[in-house]
Amino acid sequence: MGFTSLHLAKRTGRLAALALLAASLTGCQVISGSPQYTLARVIDATPDVPAPGGLDVYQNSTVSLYNIGFGTASSYIPVTPGSLSYSIDIAGTRQQLANVGGTFALGAQYTVLIGNVTANLRMTVLKDQSIPAPTGQVAFRFLDQSTRTGLVDIYLLPLGSTLTAASPILSGIGFDNAPSYIDVPSGTYSIVVVPTGTVPGSGTSPLYSGSQIDYASGAARTIVLIDQPLVTTPSLKVIPADDYDSPVATN
């Protein structure tokens, strides 16, 4: 569930093609829902920030991150629980582009998502899963922040399977979808994304076809679809974003 965001940017412009991002984390990679902490991270999914191209992120008017770029995801950072506000400026300036506020609960984890093109820039606060998926399951959340492609279907292909024998885990996903977690059996999967309605084996190339990755029991992952600049043919990449890992599990 996202909190209210404000659209403050005035610049137009779009970049072509598509990439799939799920931001990798450093530092707090194993999160076990310790109640004494509230954790927040920032993901930048906006493709056309004005020059010089980076963003400074402020929390309650105090700088939190400097000069982050498109496709960046921070590690989880401890924050004081309660009402917090976040804003973004063009790096090195105090030209604010957008802001958002919300209540951050004790013991919870959040993603501050920066999305859309600059002309309609917005920030959204999402509550992340901070508890394990059911035993034998892994939780996936897909966020579509791609502004240049239409609706997509998303597949999780088990090891040794083919797209022609699979059914999509999600169909008709579009920009700024309302995200929720989906539990699937833990195991080894490849993420494949195709335009909605694509018939497997019809000759249409996937927008993305990832390598096989092992997902351990109890894990939770967020995958963000973003525009990829300077590419004439739509393409995708995937980087895993770790919302939760069991303290005893390994990938």
What are these regions (language model features)?
Residues 17-22:
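Hydrophobic helical h-region of N-terminal Sec-dependent signal peptides
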Residues 28-251:
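Intrinsically disordered, low-complexity polar regions and short flexible loop motifs
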